[in-house]
């Protein structure tokens, strides 16, 4: 009877990879790359959801009679947006004020809301808060027709509006001129004081 051929058995386990081998390093890099890819994907989805929620709020609070918004109107709408959690914060404060409750309840939710509002308020006061471009009639019309589909977000034009946009241009120009004048006076004072110091040092 012929002998069975020697060789690897069908059920033999796979060869163990040495933890410090190049193959192990390659597998580790591939796993890290996949994890990073999933991380970025989740971050993008979360960011899109947050943008979608913001745009949905603005669409729900548009004045149906307006065909276009002025900068002042847009600023007033943003002020309402920044106060959108007021009633919820009041409810949290009311629940926490009960004497029979020990410790603060809903503290994580309250902290998240306040952190979000502080960040948005800083953006609005500084370089501007990004909102749908409701100042342009065509862009406003497109935004009104949006059906909350996140895939259609690229079709919605955005623009930044800051708190100073509520001030008329004439007032802003006057304020800028005054500030520039004050800065000029300060520079002249600094130069004169430097000259005096140099003369004193030489003497």
Curated annotation (Swiss-Prot):
Keywords: ADP-ribosylation, Nucleus, Ribosome biogenesis. It is found in: Nucleus. InterPro entries: Tma16, Tma16_sf. Residues 1-40 are annotated as: Disordered. One of its GO terms (molecular function) is preribosome binding. Pfam families: Tma16. GO terms for biological process: ribosomal large subunit biogenesis. GO terms for cellular component: nucleus. The keyword Hydrolase does not apply. The keyword Nucleus applies. The modification ADP-ribosylserine is found at residue 9. It comes from the Eukaryota. Involved in the biogenesis of the 60S ribosomal subunit in the nucleus. Belongs to the TMA16 family. Associates with pre-60S ribosomal particles. This is Translation machinery-associated protein 16. The gene is TMA16.
